[in-house]
């Protein structure tokens, strides 16, 4: 079904939308069976109201841009079954397990997320819609099933910001607020953010069926992912080994992109890793301000397991966990009668795939850093030059985003133009030493300064979702002023553009930003 985007027809959209969400498509995750999920109604929020809405995501889903203004919209996207919600559209929460902070945590699952169905996208793909904060589920454990306004706004803004940075991510259609109180470290108010993704299958889904010794369900899940998202794997000599390779390589590419923009996820547990290699579960994330390779964005991560510099290593480790879960499937088609021999070969094959992670990640990050430095030609010492810059930034706590953005102003021949970026460094002599190396390297390039600057400004964003920017929007939203959420969302749609009217959003963080802390409490 396709929905008209005209204002005249928008009023009729909600009933059709709810009906479409309630009609599972062939091959949808919900059709896998009760072993994979639990169907249950959402717990409606009291007097919900719209905080933010992405007309871009609406367009992707072929929904009218006026949808959020329609009566019943806020109710529908908090899972309220009392309006426009057909009987067959019961939401579901999926079950999975996983490793949290490196320790096996056993069964987890969607503790406050409810998937309400799928919609066809204008790009030919199908997208699941998931309500984060939709209420308690059988997997909530001690939680209340709610999300708070603070974390919901952060996820809404960052999902869309990452998309416009060109980084694979779940999207966000809307965030709905309520005055309903929620107890966290203090009393906050409840909210629901509507996540949008082709799939919400995580590494932890595979770990769950492996740990429960259900190879039949493990295979059913793997077949679902292959048939729907990795059909080329079906033609491989070993489809399940090919699935592991696809997930491993996508994850390596993803984390290289994170590192290149200074993004820290904060909670890289295996249950927060997407089988499609997209960024998922925005919690205590953060973009690095003053560069510190050991930066920890999550206040709860006291050991620094998920620090900026650790992200590639942790992602690789998580792929090992996925490989272990897939071992019962790897090599099945070889027809090896002896179980021990088959298992031994499966381990060898999986290890060979896992060895490709650093082989993929290293060159991917080098390409990204070469683009950030404006180097069109590949030279042997480029990685060393980039690492030396990061070391110099680390020593001076130079701002990550501004440093790379201002590098475009450096001239091949005129050191006096270094001032804008040089001023970001405490140890300016150290910067000068690096800048001389950089200029020498630029002398090998054929592009002139102007052409290089244009290319660099396409690789180095001027605007990222810094914590203090999100905090300002959150504080205003708590006062029912949602204009800053909208303004920030619009700015972050064009992260590489100058936008001189919004220069303040690209400035160094104010002093008070240093006291901001984000944690797993959301």
Curated annotation (Swiss-Prot):
Keywords from the named record: ATP-binding, Magnesium, Manganese, Metal-binding, Nucleotide-binding, Nucleotidyltransferase, Transferase
Catalyzed reaction equations: L-seryl-[protein] + ATP = 3-O-(5'-adenylyl)-L-seryl-[protein] + diphosphate; L-threonyl-[protein] + ATP = 3-O-(5'-adenylyl)-L-threonyl-[protein] + diphosphate; L-tyrosyl-[protein] + ATP = O-(5'-adenylyl)-L-tyrosyl-[protein] + diphosphate; L-histidyl-[protein] + UTP = N(tele)-(5'-uridylyl)-L-histidyl-[protein] + diphosphate
Lineage top rank: taxon: Bacteria
A GO MF label: AMPylase activity
EC numbers on record: 2.7.7.-, 2.7.7.108
Cofactors that this protein relies on: Mg(2+); Mn(2+)
Cited InterPro entries: SelO
Binding site for Mg(2+): 272, 281
Catalytic class of the enzyme: transferase
NCBIfam families listed in its UniProt record: PRK00029.1
HAMAP family per record: YdiU_SelO
Family: Belongs to the SELO family.
Protein name: Protein nucleotidyltransferase YdiU
Source species: Burkholderia cenocepacia (strain ATCC BAA-245 / DSM 16553 / LMG 16656 / NCTC 13227 / J2315 / CF5610)
Primary gene name: ydiU
């Amino acid at each position: 079904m396709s929905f008209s985007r005209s204002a005249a027809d928008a009023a009729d959209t909600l009933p059709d939308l709810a009906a479409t969400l309630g009609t599972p498509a062939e091959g949808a995750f919900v059709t896998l069976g009760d072993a994979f999920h639990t169907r249950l109604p959402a717990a409606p929020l009291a007097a919900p109201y719209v905080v933010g809405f992405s007309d871009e995501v609406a367009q992707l889903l072929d929904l009218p841009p006026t949808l959020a203004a329609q009566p019943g919209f806020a109710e529908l996207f908090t899972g309220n079954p009392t309006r426009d919600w057909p009987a067959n559209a019961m939401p579901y929460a999926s079950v999975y397990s996983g490793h949290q902070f490196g320790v096996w945590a056993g069964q987890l699952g969607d503790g406050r997320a409810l998937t309400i169905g799928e919609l066809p996208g204008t790009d030919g793909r199908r997208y699941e819609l998931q309500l984060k904060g939709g209420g308690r589920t059988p997997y909530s454990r001690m939680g209340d099933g709610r999300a708070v306004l603070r974390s919901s706004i952060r996820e809404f803004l960052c999902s869309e910001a990452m998309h416009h940075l060109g980084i694979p991510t779940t999207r966000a259609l809307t965030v709905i607020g309520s005055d309903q109180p929620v107890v966290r470290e203090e009393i906050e108010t409840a909210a629901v953010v509507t996540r949008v993704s082709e799939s919400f299958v995580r590494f932890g889904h595979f770990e769950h069926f492996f740990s429960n010794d259900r190879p039949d369900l493990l295979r059913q899940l793997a077949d679902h992912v292959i048939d729907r998202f990795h059909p080329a794997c079906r033609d491989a000599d070993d489809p399940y080994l090919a699935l592991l390779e696809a997930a491993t390589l996508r994850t390596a590419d993803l984390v290289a992109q994170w590192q290149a923009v200074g993004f820290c996820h904060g909670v890289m547990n295996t249950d927060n890793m997407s089988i499609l290699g997209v960024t998922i579960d925005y919690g205590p994330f953060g973009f690095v301000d003053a560069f510190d390779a050991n930066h920890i964005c999550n206040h709860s991560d006291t050991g620094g397991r998920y620090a900026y510099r650790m992200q590639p290593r942790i992602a690789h480790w998580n792929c090992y966990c996925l490989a272990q879960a897939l071992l019962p499937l790897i090599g099945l088609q070889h027809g090896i009668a002896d179980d021990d021999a088959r298992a031994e070969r499966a381990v060898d094959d999986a290890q060979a795939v896992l060895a490709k992670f650093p082989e993929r990640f290293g060159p991917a990050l080098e390409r990204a850093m070469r683009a950030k430095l404006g180097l069109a030609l590949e030279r042997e010492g480029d990685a060393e030059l980039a690492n030396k810059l990061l070391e110099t930034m680390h020593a001076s706590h130079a701002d990550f985003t501004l440093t790379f953005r201002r590098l475009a102003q450096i001239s091949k021949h005129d050191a006096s133009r270094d001032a804008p970026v040089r001023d970001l460094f405490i140890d300016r002599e150290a910067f000068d030493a690096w800048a001389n190396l950089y200029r020498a390297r630029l002398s090998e390039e054929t592009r002139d300064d102007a052409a290089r600057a244009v290319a660099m400004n396409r690789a180095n964003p001027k605007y990222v979702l810094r914590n203090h920017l999100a905090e300002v929007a959150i504080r205003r939203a708590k006062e029912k002023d949602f204009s800053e959420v909208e303004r920030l969302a619009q700015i972050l749609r064009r992260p590489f553009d100058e936008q001189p009217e919004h220069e303040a959003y690209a400035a160094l963080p104010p002093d008070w930003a240093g006291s901001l802390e984000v944690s797993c409490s959301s």
